[in-house]
Design a protein with these regions (language model features):
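Membrane-interface helix/loop caps of multi-pass membrane proteins
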Residues: 1-173
Length: 173
C-alpha cells in the first residue's frame, strides 16, 4: 500500500539529502531523520496491526520481509562498490576498504565510523566508500530491537503504553 503523503515526504527527504551532498545547503541530516520517522511510523503500525489481529508478532515473517526488501540491493551495491574500489583506491587503503565493507555488510558501520571519528564533516582524506551505510546500519539496528520493544509494551498495557513508551524513547533520544 502506497500512501501518497508518505511518498511525498520520502521525496522531500531524498531532496534534502541530495542538496546537502551537492553542497548547496547544510542540514541534509534532516532528510535522514525524516526517513527514520517514516520507517518508524510504518513499522510500528505494521507491528501493532499484527498484534491486534493475532496477539503476537511473527519475528520470522517480520525479519524475512526486511531481508527480502533490503538485503538484495544492499549487498549488490556493496559487491559493486568493493570491486570498483579495489581497482580505484590506492593499494594502501585496501585494508580499510575490506574493514569498511565488512562493517557495512553486517550493519555496524555506524559504530565503526563513530569509533574512527569519521563523518561527513570530519573527513580529511578520501572518505570511506561506504560511509553512507551508517544510516542503513541505524535503520537495521532499529528493525532488530523495535519488534521486541513494541511487543513488550503492548502486552503490558496495550496501545496506550506503546504510545507512552514511544514518547519516552523520543524524549530520551
Amino acid at each position: 500500500m502506497r500512501i501518497p503523503q508518505i511518498q511525498a515526504l520520502r521525496a522531500f527527504a531524498a531532496l534534502l539529502v541530495v542538496i546537502y551532498h551537492a553542497k548547496i545547503t547544510s542540514g541534509g541530516y534532516i532528510g535522514v531523520d525524516i526517513f527514520y520517522v517514516i520507517s518508524g511510523y510504518l513499522i510500528t503500525g505494521l507491528l501493532l496491526r499484527e498484534l491486534e489481529k493475532t496477539g503476537t508478532i511473527s519475528l520470522r515473517a517480520f525479519y524475512l520481509r526486511r531481508v527480502k526488501r533490503l538485503l538484495p540491493t544492499s549487498f549488490f551495491v556493496l559487491f559493486v562498490t568493493a570491486i570498483s574500489a579495489w581497482y580505484l583506491y590506492p593499494s594502501t587503503m585496501r585494508s580499510e576498504l575490506g574493514r569498511d565493507i565488512a562493517a557495512a555488510g553486517v550493519y555496524i558501520s555506524n559504530y565503526l565510523f563513530a569509533f574512527w571519528q569519521m563523518d561527513y564533516q570530519n573527513l580529511n582524506a578520501m572518505p570511506p566508500v561506504v560511509i553512507h551505510y551508517w544510516s542503513l546500519a541505524v535503520e537495521e539496528q532499529f528493525y532488530i530491537f523495535w519488534p521486541f520493544i513494541i511487543y513488550f509494551l503492548y502486552k503490558r498495557g496495550g496501545k496506550r503504553l506503546v504510545g507512552r513508551g514511544i514518547a519516552a524513547i523520543s524524549v530520551l533520544s
